[in-house]
Amino acid sequence: MLDLKAVAADFESFERRLARRGEGAVQALAPVKPLAARRRELNVLLEKQKKEQADANANIRQLARTDKDAVEGARASLRALGDEVKKTEAALGEVEAELTRLLMLVPNPPSDSVPDGKDEHDNVVVRTWGEKKAYGFTPKPHWELGEALGVLEWQQAAKLSGSRFTILKGAAARLERAIVSFFIDVHTSRGYTEILPPYLVTGETMTGTGQLPKFEEDLFKTTNEPPMYLIPTAEVPVTNMHRDEIFEANAMPVSYCAFSPCFRAEAGSAGRDTRGIMRQHQFHKVELVKLSKAEESDAEHEKMLDDACEVLRRLGLHHRVSLLCTGDMGFSSAKTYDIEVWCPGQGAYREISSVSNCEDFQARRIRVRYRGENGKPRLAHTLNGSGVAVGRTIVAILEQCQEADGTVVIPEPLRPYMGGLERIAAETFPRGVER
């Protein structure tokens, strides 16, 4: 959330910065201006009324010594003035509540280093790791490989849960567990503390990281009141862990990695990635989260990006890093890198991680701070990134590591987690006859 005082003091500056995101961001900010002006008017009026109250109290004390007959009339005037103060305070409270509601709908202004653009086509590739493998055959997409190997099952999953769900069988299920353990081991060796968070959280927690109130249609929630929400990413509970806390400066940065299932309604995704496991209602991910000093968050952002890329480098998976343009950034982010893994069966790079610096946007909502050099509390900066998406790593392994005979070579770092298994070959599982 934006700082109301800063917005009110220089509305035009925020308007210019948000205009880089597009007209929608400017429109979200527009209603704030007249309300901020009304807030100033009410604050001036309240200050005036409280001064009049203080003067009236002083006058009553003086009258009590010099003109007792006039005291009762003065007290009646003071009571009337008190009623006016209460009315002004109530009006101010309503305005401030509405301002808070409106500011919850305004996205984070982009960092100056973010390129301008309308959509993903304007993102800037900043580096590439590895080379595209040359195949002596036409590589297959992961959904064909998974079906031929018998390890990815969609028909039975649809019977259980509908579309955008997958059952992993045999070696694919083992591969998923291996990937999770490998990712966690790599990240903890690089200074992250492992967290296993709750998967159901409150509305306040969802609001803290920016999913609410704007993106409720993308979430799954319970029907009880108040509802609980299934997390769309471990970023939500882990970032909120330190809500309303103050850190000493020497404790920063705070670094966490967390494995969790993620649940997303995928509203607005009809017709996109309907085959395979690229876009699911339920998937697994290892998330990286940092709380940083404001002056160190840019450097921590680059380190987090490298940490996310490290697991792909160790697996030997060809990928590239793109800096997202202003029109393709997430709501809470000031700057985001996407890591895109090469999928030869699809002939495309596909996002496998987003690594974002939210600066103080989330921290203002959850009130997480640290003591600066003068000892005064200052808002922390929050950072998050996938380290990385597990299902999409399976996609990349199936497609990049496929062989002409239809088998898939398991990257060496994962083999110890799979009992030494070196490749995935076709498996047969019991199956009844549909009646």
UniProtKB/Swiss-Prot annotation:
Q: Which GO terms describe its molecular function?
A: ATP binding; serine-tRNA ligase activity
Keywords of the record? Aminoacyl-tRNA synthetase, ATP-binding, Cytoplasm, Ligase, Nucleotide-binding, Protein biosynthesis
InterPro entries xref list:
aa-tRNA-synt_IIb (IPR002314), aa-tRNA-synth_II (IPR006195), aa-tRNA-synth_II/BPL/LPL (IPR045864), Ser-tRNA-ligase_type_1 (IPR002317), Ser-tRNA-synth_1_N (IPR015866), SerRS_1_N_sf (IPR042103), SerRS_core (IPR033729), tRNA-bd_arm (IPR010978)
Annotated pathway, please? Aminoacyl-tRNA biosynthesis; selenocysteinyl-tRNA(Sec) biosynthesis; L-seryl-tRNA(Sec) from L-serine and tRNA(Sec): step 1/1
Q: Which positions in this protein are listed as binding L-serine?
A: T233, A234, E235, E287, S386
Q: Write down the HAMAP family for this protein, in alphabetical order.
A: Ser_tRNA_synth_type1
Species whose genome carries this gene: Anaeromyxobacter dehalogenans (strain 2CP-1 / ATCC BAA-258)
Q: Name one Pfam family in it.
A: tRNA-synt_2b
Question: Know the name of this protein?
Answer: Serine--tRNA ligase
* One GO term (biological process): seryl-tRNA aminoacylation
Q: What is the purpose of this protein?
A: Catalyzes the attachment of serine to tRNA(Ser). Is also able to aminoacylate tRNA(Sec) with serine, to form the misacylated tRNA L-seryl-tRNA(Sec), which will be further converted into selenocysteinyl-tRNA(Sec).
Cite a GO CC annotation: cytoplasm
Give the domain note.
Consists of two distinct domains, a catalytic core and a N-terminal extension that is involved in tRNA binding.
Per UniProt, subunit arrangement is:
Homodimer. The tRNA molecule binds across the dimer.
Cellular localisation: Cytoplasm
Q: Which reaction is the catalytic activity of this chain?
A: tRNA(Ser) + L-serine + ATP = L-seryl-tRNA(Ser) + AMP + diphosphate + H(+); tRNA(Sec) + L-serine + ATP = L-seryl-tRNA(Sec) + AMP + diphosphate + H(+)
EC number(s) from the headed UniProt entry: 6.1.1.11
Q: Which domain of life is it from?
A: Bacteria
Q: Spell out the family assignment given in the record's similarity comment.
A: Belongs to the class-II aminoacyl-tRNA synthetase family. Type-1 seryl-tRNA synthetase subfamily.
